Amino acid sequence: MVEKNERGKVILQTFDPYHWVIKKVIEYDFKSLYKQELADRKHFNYPPFYKLIKLVLLHKKSGYLFTGAHHLAHQLKKQLGDRVLGPEFTIIPRINTYYQQQILLKLENKLSMTKVKEFVQSTIDIWKKEDYSKSIRVKIDVDPI
C-alpha cells in the first residue's frame, strides 16, 4: 500500500484499460471522477441520493425459492411499486446447498425508513405464513455495500 507523500508503484488489473474510471485514476483526476460518480449515482437512484434495502432469500429447492421470491416481490410491489427490483438470482446463485435470490428496494431519502422497515417486516411475516414460503430463509441488508 502506498501512503500519502510516499513514492510507490500501484498496479491496476482491469478487463477494460480504456474505461473512463481507469483513465481518471491514471490522470490523477479524482475530482472529476468523484463528480461523475456522484452524477451517475443520482441518475440511477443510488446512495447517497436513495436508500437501498436488499432482501436475500435462500432455499434448498430452486423451485420453491423461485415461487416464494416472486410472491414476496409481488406483495412488496403493491405498496412500493417500481421501487422494488427483482427477484433475481444473486451473482452466486447457489452456496453450498442453498439457492439464493434477491429483491432490491430503492427508496427515496425523504421516506421514513422506520415505516418502510416496519412495512417490509410485516409483509415478510404475512408472506412466511404461506405454505410455499415457510421454509425460505430471508436475510435483510439495509444499505448494502
Please report, for each region that a protein language model flagged, where it lies by residue:
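Accessory helical-bundle/CTD segments and flexible terminal tails appended to RecA-like ATPase motors
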Residues: 2-145
